[in-house]
Structures are given as structure tokens and as C-alpha cells.
């Protein structure tokens, strides 16, 4: 993940109702939610500011109606924000014409939704190649690109199947492949696996990480499943009533929840299986033991060693000592 922003949102609001821009202006662009409600408006997004870094997987979470999908649609300008600025690759999206926005979405953005709407009368290869057909690319060239994507998403040998001949997981692979056909710089996925059976869902999550490891895309991924978010995310956004409550790494949200709303998402999770040694280690580097553990190991995997040795040194993958971990710290973590 690079710290160079791929997409920036600044003070984005989305209200539904009569002349919402004037309403916001009359309240200094910061009305409280009670005034919004009493005035007959629906608050979809409230003053959202964030940066999406190049090559990161940014997961957006929240309950139904929290504004997740609306925020993503504002980011891609499928929905116009009421006020606020959105920059993609330093381009002010609010200043682009309708045709310029269409061109950016055709060539720079990929989108996958829960209901992926494959063309039933087109084969796998034809579905995946469709965005290239829209771009006017010749058939031979677009089919060559589509075959490469078919290999990438694990559908080798099924290129001439129709959607009705595929399982749900295979159909979703086609949807993912179609969204990758234009080689997008920014990839939006809105609950792409939520309709799948648990085993297929896990398989698709693993496949998704494999694809990301190969392509290094900038990804904005919506889910309501915290286990899925932790597995996939570099950072997570938690939303509530259109407002961004917290942005941070999975470990930040588990160890330092911003409020009770965030805490509710994380309190029943098996923390020892999700958190790394780094999240609970001590900064001091001196120990009475020669035993070591890696900072990125999950806590459950080193419990026996720490509890038997009393204390261990924590090292990075270059074998540099970066901290220590004591039996007392581990015991306190387990019992909290």
C-alpha cells in the first residue's frame, strides 16, 4: 500500500429532499441531524472526508442504511453529492462533464455489485469482454484479454458456458472478471459475496486476495461482515447514519474503538485469532529469554511459547528486535 492518495473526499454531504444545497447553506453546511429530520430531509451522507491510498483495500462497514453504498456511488459520481469535493487522481470529479465521467468509469473504474446482472444470452467470455466491446475494441483483441482474465479468476475451460450453467460462485467470478476487463485503476465492490454460501464465500475471499496480490489495485470494498472486513482490509471505515465514525486498521478498531457503536462490531470476535503480536507487545526490548516471536504472528499461535518462557523478544521479518512480550501482558489480554 502506498501513502499516495488515489481518491480524496472532502466534506461530502448527500441529503434527499427539496433544494438540499440551499438548506445546507442556510445552516453553515453543518446542520445537526434533528434539524435535518424536522426540515423533511433524509441524511444519506454527513460531512464525509477520507483518502483512499494507492493499492490499498479500504473496506466500508456499517448497518443497513448507514450510507455505505451511497458514499461509494458519490465517489464514482453515479450519484452527485449535495455538496463536497471528490478528487480522483487529482482530478476534481465535480468539474467533469457527463461524457468525461462516463469515459473515466469506462476506462479507469471497475464495479462489482451483489447482484451482478450477467447477460443470460452471452457466454462467459462474451460477458467478460463486454466492457471492451463498449470501448470499440476489436473482437480478436477483446477475446484475448478476456481469456487472460478467465485464467485469473479461475474459470478455465468454462469460457463458452452460459450463466445458467454456472454455480453462484462461478457467476460471481464472471462478474469480477467483467469488472477487471478495462484494467481499472480504482475497483469498487459492493457486498459482492454476501449472497453466496459460506464455503463458496470463503473461497471467493481467498480468490479475491490472490487477484489483488497479482494486480495491486486500489479497492473500495463494502461489507456488513466484520470477519470478512478483517480478512481483506488494509483499513476499515465504520459508518453510522451517514457519518464516518472511525477509520483505521482492523487492529485499531478492535483495540481502540472510537465509541460504543464501533465496540459492538468487535466485542464478540476471537481477538487472539485476529490480532497480531505487534498490537499488544511492550516497547522495551530487553528480556531474560532468548526466545523470539514475529511481530506479525497472530496471538493465538504464540500463546504456548510465551506462557512457558515467561517473556520473549519480538522481531520483525528482518530479525530486528522491535519489542518484547511478557507472560503478564498475554494473561491480561486473555482475561480482558
Show the residue positions of the predicted features.
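Conserved ABC ATPase "signature" region
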Residues: 26-34, 89-92, 133, 140-157
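Helix-to-loop junction immediately C-terminal to a conserved catalytic motif
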Residues: 76
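Short coil-to-helix segment of the ABC ATPase nucleotide-binding domain corresponding to the Q-loop/switch region
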Residues: 122-129
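Conserved ABC ATPase signature
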Residues: 162-166, 170
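A short, proline-enriched helix->beta-strand linker immediately N-terminal to the Walker B motif
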Residues: 181-185
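ABC ATPase "signature
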Residues: 247-248, 256, 324
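The conserved cystathionine-beta-synthase
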Residues: 288-320, 325-336
